């Protein structure tokens, strides 16, 4: 047990401070915006301080654990803790949410409620990553969906209600499978039902039952990740949402699905995961090719970036399915890497729209001269997305490739085939990313229009772009900073498998 409830404070502070904002007298939009940014910065500083002084990187066990009896009747505990798997995602959540709050400055309609929803989402996401109790994990998982739905339905494009409804139908529907899995896995094979993840990790199940549990959790996490064919909510949602919301979706929400796959499917159900891992590899490979092939056909700029997210998530699925030390480490690194890259691309797409008021690529062209700073940052981050050496994505994808090669589970011909198809996907990636830049910034469509000029990136946008670019380059140059956080936990998870 931890002496000081750091994690409880970290989870509860954003939503508590956000609730306070709703009840205080309205002092104007500017006050609400700066209040939210200050809360996010303070939360990030508290989190960083707590982890620096309490987290030991060479310890694969749960650290900073907190265990409080909550509801006696259900034997329900408020049980929090972190390890190498969750620390990176929690810090990523804090960083991206802070930048998203800064990106939300143009929001003026109901800005107080908008910023409250961002802070409520912040608490739900950190709660999901730090939960050590299955029912608490489910509650935090659902808590995070409510503000996302409201952010999607109240702020965005003309079809925002349609996209928000589609999002909630997919995610709430998949949550039924998550709840059934949580209740089933906690009630099975014990005189005293337990929801403690540490105890459940040592539990064994009949093969058929373990497979059923695995499929239930897989459906829930496949929607959030997303894994094809359960991905169709994502392009519509990104296409209509405000770009600060898109930053939170691409940077954090998608990573919750991948985190759940490792935390529950892989750690609690190793035998079933071993059986399903070849199918994950196949689906991940198809996903890379499918999304990379579909993306060039998207006229909507944000939808094209959304399909690139689906493609990049394929590498994470393959890394999880490889059941190797490099593969799983590469998947975790890709979770962090794409969190930064995806959020950055959506921010730049949104800030471009604020200036030219166009979202369809075939209507753009010739803006590079008018907005050179946005053009430069968009080009650099497009290079990061296509895994240019020196950027975080390159290292992550390279380690995933190495994980496939070193896997002892698969035959040589299977590994060659998977790598070959993945390589085709990597060839297609520059095609849709570079054509996107060409359609946006090159040509003569807008440059020849008389009396038409655009303001380039201001200090706020430039600061935000550079802030998100620095960790992408930093991880690309020194990936061990992220890998060292999770390496011992990865070894601990893989110790339950016969190969790795």
UniProtKB/Swiss-Prot annotation:
It is an enzyme of class 7 (translocase). The keyword Coiled coil does not apply. It is found in: Plastid, Chloroplast thylakoid membrane. GO terms for molecular function: NADH dehydrogenase (ubiquinone) activity; ubiquinone binding. It is a multi-pass membrane protein. GO terms for cellular component: chloroplast thylakoid membrane. Keywords: Chloroplast, Membrane, NAD, NADP, Plastid, Plastoquinone, Quinone, Thylakoid, Translocase, Transmembrane, Transmembrane helix. Its EC number is 7.1.1.-. InterPro entries: NADH_Q_OxRdtase_chain4, NADH_Q_OxRdtase_chainM/4, NADH_UbQ_OxRdtase, ND/Mrp_TM. Its main location: plastid. Belongs to the complex I subunit 4 family. PANTHER family: NAD(P)H-QUINONE OXIDOREDUCTASE CHAIN 4, CHLOROPLASTIC (PTHR43507:SF21), NADH-UBIQUINONE OXIDOREDUCTASE CHAIN 4 (PTHR43507). This is NAD(P)H-quinone oxidoreductase chain 4, chloroplastic. It comes from Arabis hirsuta. The gene is ndhD.
């Amino acid at each position: 047990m931890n002496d000081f409830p750091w994690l409880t404070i970290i989870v509860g502070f954003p939503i508590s401070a956000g609730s306070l904002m709703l009840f205080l007298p309205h002092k104007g939009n500017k006050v609400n915006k700066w209040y939210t940014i200050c809360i996010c910065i303070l939360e990030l500083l508290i989190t960083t301080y707590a982890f620096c002084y309490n987290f030991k990187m060479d310890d694969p066990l749960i650290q900073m654990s907190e265990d409080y009896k909550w509801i006696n009747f259900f034997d329900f505990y408020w049980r929090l803790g972190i390890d190498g798997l969750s620390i990176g995602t929690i810090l990523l959540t804090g960083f991206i949410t802070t930048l998203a709050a800064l990106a939300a400055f143009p929001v003026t309609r109901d800005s107080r409620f908008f910023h409250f929803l961002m802070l409520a989402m912040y608490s739900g996401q950190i709660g999901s990553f730090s939960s050590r109790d299955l029912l608490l994990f489910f509650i935090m998982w659902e808590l995070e969906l409510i503000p996302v739905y409201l952010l999607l339905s109240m702020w965005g494009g003309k079809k925002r209600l349609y996209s928000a409804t589609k999002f909630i139908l997919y995610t709430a529907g998949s949550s039924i499978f998550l709840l059934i899995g949580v209740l089933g896995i906690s009630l099975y094979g014990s005189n005293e039902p337990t929801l403690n993840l540490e105890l459940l990790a040592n539990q064994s199940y009949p093969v058929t039952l373990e497979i059923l549990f695995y499929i239930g959790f897989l459906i829930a996490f496949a929607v959030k990740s997303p894994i094809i064919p359960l991905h169709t909510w994502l392009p519509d949602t990104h296409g209509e949402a405000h770009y600060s919301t898109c930053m939170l979706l691409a940077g954090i929400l998608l990573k919750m699905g991948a985190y759940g796959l490792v935390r529950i499917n892989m750690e609690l159900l190793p035998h079933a995961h071993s059986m399903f891992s070849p199918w994950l590899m196949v689906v991940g490979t198809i996903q890379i090719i499918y999304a990379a092939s579909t993306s060039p056909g998207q006229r909507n700029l944000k939808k094209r970036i959304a399909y690139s997210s689906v493609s990049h998530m394929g590498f994470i699925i393959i890394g999880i399915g490889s059941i190797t030390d490099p593969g799983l480490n590469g998947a975790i690194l890709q979770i962090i890497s794409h969190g930064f890259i995806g959020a950055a691309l959506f921010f730049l797409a949104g800030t471009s729209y604020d200036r030219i008021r166009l979202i369809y690529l075939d209507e753009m062209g010739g803006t590079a001269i008018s907005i050179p700073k946005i053009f430069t940052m968009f080009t650099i981050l497009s290079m990061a997305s296509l895994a240019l050496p020196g950027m975080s994505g390159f290292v992550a994808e390279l380690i995933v490739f190495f994980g496939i090669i070193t896997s002892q589970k698969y035959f040589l011909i299977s590994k060659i085939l998977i790598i070959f198809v993945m390589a085709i996907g990597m060839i297609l990636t520059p095609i849709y990313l570079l054509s996107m830049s060409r359609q946006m910034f090159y040509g003569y469509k807008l440059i020849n229009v008389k009396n038409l000029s655009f303001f380039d990136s201001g200090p706020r946008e430039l600061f935000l772009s550079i802030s998100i670019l620095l960790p992408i380059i930093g991880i690309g140059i020194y990936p061990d900073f992220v890998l060292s956080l999770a390496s011992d936990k990865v070894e601990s998870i893989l110790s339950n498998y016969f190969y790795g």
